[in-house]
Amino acid sequence: MSIDNKLFVTEEDEEDRTQDRADVEDESNDIDMIADENGTNSAIANEQEEKSEEVKAEDDTGEEEEDDPVIEEFPLKISGEEESLHVFQYANRPRLVGRKPAEHPFISAARYKPKSHLWEIDIPLDEQAFYNKDKAESEWNGVNVQTLKGVGVENNGQYAAFVKDMQVYLVPIERVAQLKPFFKYIDDANVTRKQEDARRNPNPSSQRAQVVTMSVKSVNDPSQNRLTGSLLAHKVADEEANIELTWAEGTFEQFKDTIVKEAEDKTLVALEKQEDYIDNLV
């Protein structure tokens, strides 16, 4: 019979039972301590792993910065406020000069209407390809140029830039014009043809006297302002005379020297504080 089933026990048996209970408690305490140590070790391991990931991320950022470092900084200058810089956009495909596309087509004449901001430039036609000289002389008044036409649109905040002597110079762009083919010679030929037909075949009915009723319009008559928007712009452009301009090549270096000289006499002053500028960005 075991000691636990005995009704009466001796002092020796009681001492043995007490010793067994103490041994069991010591074993449970040892198990708890081992569990605590394992938990502490896992927490330390997680913390070390997070630190290693942060260090790795910092290393990756440093590697990216090293891959794309700032090589050099350039002073920035804005000049050319007194210049009138226009940008032309050509809708046609540029010609190839050798294997590279030309910067712009060869221009034989240029015209400008300052009030309407209307540009017209003439480009000589290539008579060696896709050109019917006989038909051009017989039907189109011997046209040998292609006219490009476009209206300059105002653009604020756009600049053209160039680098000289390790400094960047910005020049404000006044207007941008997209130039497209304009077949004026067809309109001129149609007008000439109608005038010749009118001279050859005069209409007697048009020579008859007609009664015309005339009335005086009031100053406040709204019908006087019927031409608005694009219609008014076309009317103004048609009535405005062209200013004939001379197209000059090889003047870019002279233009740059003028801008550099003008920038030397000016100092840029900020219009607002740095804090206000950052607040506007945010």
From Swiss-Prot:
GO cellular component: nucleus; RNA polymerase III complex
Source species: Saccharomyces cerevisiae (strain ATCC 204508 / S288c) (Baker's yeast)
Domain of life: Eukaryota
Listed Acidic residues bias regions: 10-35, 60-70
Phosphothreonine modifications at: T61
Keywords from the UniProt entry: DNA-directed RNA polymerase, Nucleus, Phosphoprotein, Transcription
PANTHER family: DNA-DIRECTED RNA POLYMERASE III SUBUNIT RPC5 (PTHR12069:SF0), DNA-DIRECTED RNA POLYMERASES III 80 KDA POLYPEPTIDE RNA POLYMERASE III SUBUNIT 5 (PTHR12069)
GO biological process: termination of RNA polymerase III transcription; transcription by RNA polymerase III; transcription initiation at RNA polymerase III promoter; tRNA transcription by RNA polymerase III
Role: DNA-dependent RNA polymerase catalyzes the transcription of DNA into RNA using the four ribonucleoside triphosphates as substrates. Specific peripheric component of RNA polymerase III which synthesizes small RNAs, such as 5S rRNA and tRNAs. The RPC53/RPC4-RPC37/RPC5 subcomplex is required for terminator recognition and reinitiation.
Further remark: Present with 1590 molecules/cell in log phase SD medium.
Entries under InterPro entries matching the protein: RNA_pol_III_Rpc5
Subunit structure and binding partners: Component of the RNA polymerase III (Pol III) complex consisting of 17 subunits. Interacts with RPC53/RPC4. RPC53/RPC4, RPC37/RPC5 and RPC11/RPC10 probably form a Pol III subcomplex.
Protein name (Swiss-Prot/TrEMBL): DNA-directed RNA polymerase III subunit RPC5
